[in-house]
């Protein structure tokens, strides 16, 4: 007979003392929830034994459970051939006061076969202990063994509680002390629990023992597989009490709740910007460090976010899975489709308190506010130029690097931005999707339409501090300022000639290349400048560029305009 619970020594405890074993028939009697509970309890018990330093080697049962196999398959060295069936009423004679379920009794009898049961000759038709006197010795041995087992079972619940209390108490204390005794040899990272280290090691080994039967995707943690399965079932057990939105992960709900509180606990030490998610702060920090860990294998381009790389890859594939139900236009990103839909609805939720201008996206409002504040947080390390948007800085950097990833299939012209290529293609197609409601004039750029509308309003919000001259475009003001500074930052590598505008340099380069992308549909003549093509078209239409008020003569040649003006004014 074992001693009282207090006399149990932790050093002699084994995993089999806290494990239950099932046959195939018994295992099939359990429903899915019970099977999952069994797996979780057995794995937790083993982790607890490992934690207190009792389990020397991993049992086959644990390996089996970790791999998602059925536990009744496991070969156990303690198991021997099944003895003749012990009927339930005979077991009740042995344990008259217990009343355990039949299958559990069989588990107990099977687990403790070592007590001489291999020689047990139980008559099939025994109905009571009195009829089995001939087997008294064998019975006594079995009875003693099962009495010992009975005491173990009666103590099991209390023992497990004490054991869990012991192990959880120690784990809880470690949480407060911050002690991390378990170190990864691969990367030096430390953990306070051995089970956490074991999970971490799978990152280095690439081991993913938990596989989804539905789609075959594998994970290195059982909890990740459980969460993944909700994608197939559509289960979202975590619901926001504030707005009713549901999530399939508790962490997603926790993150979502911060939206309602407005709290932003994660602050950037570099610039002071705050975020409601630690992941967003991590991504933001890459702006300052310039780190881009996600690289495209197709073109070598690197990104600071994995989601941006995923979206970029679609460019190479040409895939556009997100289609607008309103107009049929397709997009490579769902976020772009969401933004596009606002064109049809006309919704603009985000309003500037400074000037009243409204925007369909919060990010656009944030960027717009920098016009009023003059803030330019994104600075180029190469030349010191600062920008209001990180994307503008990224594009600017390509000037120094000379990178042009996006090539036109029609004329082979290359661009540093995909949006520039899209705009350029409209030269070949003649597409002008942006139309003025006031006069009907159409443009191939939304920015051109915005600028054009100012003609009707007469608004000139961009004023030069040097001379007071006002402009309807910020870009025009920037170009104008160069007049005062005399700066010519755009230099031709071919001949050394410098220009104060990048567009002038682009046009100039065509002299060296001989390129003439602007072709007249009427006569086929080609030009290297769109403005020259527009003037040329007037030859066919008969339109005159300039007509003085003092005479009836008109000029269709821009070179003669100055001479006409002087002649009309009576100058020599």
From Swiss-Prot:
Gene3D superfamilies: 6.10.140.140, Classic Zinc Finger. Residues 13-84 form the KRAB domain. One of its GO terms (molecular function) is zinc ion binding. The keyword Transcription regulation applies. It is found in: Nucleus. It comes from Homo sapiens. The gene is ZNF98. The keyword Manganese does not apply. SUPFAM superfamilies: beta-beta-alpha zinc fingers, KRAB domain (Kruppel-associated box). This is Zinc finger protein 98. Its main location: nucleus. Keywords: DNA-binding, Metal-binding, Nucleus, Repeat, Transcription, Transcription regulation, Zinc, Zinc-finger. Pfam families: KRAB, zf-C2H2. May be involved in transcriptional regulation. InterPro entries: KRAB, KRAB_dom_sf, Znf_C2H2_sf, Znf_C2H2_type. A zinc finger (C2H2-type) spans 182-204, 210-232, 238-260, 266-288, 294-316, 322-344, 350-372, 378-400, 406-428, 434-456, 462-484, 490-512, 518-540. GO terms for cellular component: nucleus. Belongs to the krueppel C2H2-type zinc-finger protein family. One of its GO terms (biological process) is regulation of DNA-templated transcription.
